[in-house]
Amino acid sequence: MMVVATTKILTAAEYLQREEQATEKSEFIQGEIIPIAGASANHNRLTFNLSRLLPLEIGDRQYEIFVSDMRLWIAESESYFYPDVMVIAEEPKFTDNSQMAVTNPSLIAEVLSTSAAGFDKNQKFGFYRTIPKLQEYLLIDQFCYRVEHYQKVGDRQWLLTELMGENAEIEFSFMKI
């Protein structure tokens, strides 16, 4: 269950100003600030290992990979998130010259925690699905060998492939390996 830290509706500019001074990260969802809990060691291992396994270049195509500290701006819902891993299959589109938030990931991966698993699977994925460039969404279980891999197959259509076991392999549609 997510805990809302403030009840006052803020603007995105007010959130960014607060975030500059904050000692801990928080997400901004339609005017509300949501604190992000600290990540476990296993959560950090999974995030690091996934980002390390993703290629930065395939043929003549380059990819940008961002881990945990890069904000994602979703204009349609006026929300900022901190996905665990984002892959951008073209030039990153930043919200401004500070290059602190991107808008065009092709892949987003979230390592599930006990406290936020339901939110990541439902509400957050609902926000993410409005990103025009998003093609794939991974939900990684940190307690067992299980990954939910969502692939965009059409306008408002997503295909779920459930991967289980330590030898399961993922094929990404946006990344031709």
Swiss-Prot record:
Domain of life: Bacteria
Protein name, entry field: Uncharacterized protein sll1609
Pfam family, one: Uma2
InterPro entries from the UniProt entry: Nuclease_put_TT1808, Restrct_endonuc-II-like, Uma2
The species this protein was found in: Synechocystis sp. (strain ATCC 27184 / PCC 6803 / Kazusa)
Family: To Synechocystis PCC 6803 slr1290 and sll0925.
